[in-house]
Swiss-Prot record:
GO molecular function term, any single one: GTPase activity
Organism: Mus musculus (Mouse)
InterPro entries for the chain: P-loop_NTPase (IPR027417), Small_GTP-bd (IPR005225), Small_GTPase_ARF (IPR024156), Small_GTPase_ARF/SAR (IPR006689)
A Pfam family reported for this protein in Swiss-Prot or TrEMBL: Arf
PROSITE patterns, per database record: ARF
Name this protein carries in UniProt: ADP-ribosylation factor-like protein 5C
Keyword tags: GTP-binding, Lipoprotein, Myristate, Nucleotide-binding
Binding site for GTP: 23-30, 66-70, 125-128
Length: 179
């Protein structure tokens, strides 16, 4: 009976899906969140703690938690994992020096029990910048092909123009309606 009600809610009603947006500092997490919300560039400063906004895409409601990415704040990310259905990992495609740190944080998250059923969307941000890493390069460095227990998708984007962001949201919406 509960499954029937859940299915009817997905078809006819709206169900809220918790999303956490993570990534190292200055990757573009907050810019992406507000690009989703307003379709405009919003001047941001470093997030201390979190920002929360609801994004609606065709009856699918996403409650998005944008978490600060500074080193001192990353240890608090796990307090937001409970009931998260999606993880959006934002990567600065120009920051080759910290990609190892990003990989470590990604696999630490994926190993967390509270995220065992989460789908992962990776935004390779700043694709508009010359010599930025491609999604293929990032995918290879992060060894994304080794991720077997989580549906995942990597999407190149530019947070400032919004390019690539709708495709990522559509992937999330498809994942939400498939479950």
């Amino acid at each position: 009976m509960g499954q029937l009600i859940a299915k009817l809610m997905r078809i006819f009603g709206s169900q809220e899906h918790k999303v956490i947006i993570v990534g190292l500092d200055n990757a573009g997490k907050t810019t992406i969140l507000y690009q989703f919300l307003t379709n405009e560039v919003v001047h941001t400063c470093s997030t201390i703690g979190s920002n929360v906004e609801e994004i609606v895409l065709r009856k699918t409601h996403f409650l998005m938690w944008d978490l600060g990415g500074q080193e001192a704040l990353r240890s608090t990310w796990d307090t937001y994992y409970s009931n998260a259905e999606f993880v959006i990992l934002v990567i600065d495609s120009t920051d080759r020096n910290r990609l190892l740190t990003t990989r470590e944080e990604l696999y630490k998250m994926l190993a967390h029990e509270a995220l065992q059923n989460a789908s992962v969307l990776i935004f390779a941000n700043k694709q508009d910048v010359k010599d930025s890493m491609t999604t293929a390069e990032i995918s290879q460095f992060l060894t994304l092909s080794a991720i077997k227990d989580h549906p995942w998708h990597i999407q190149g984007c530019c947070a400032l123009t919004g390019e690539g962001l709708p495709a990522g949201l559509q992937w999330m919406q498809a994942q939400a309606t498939a479950n």
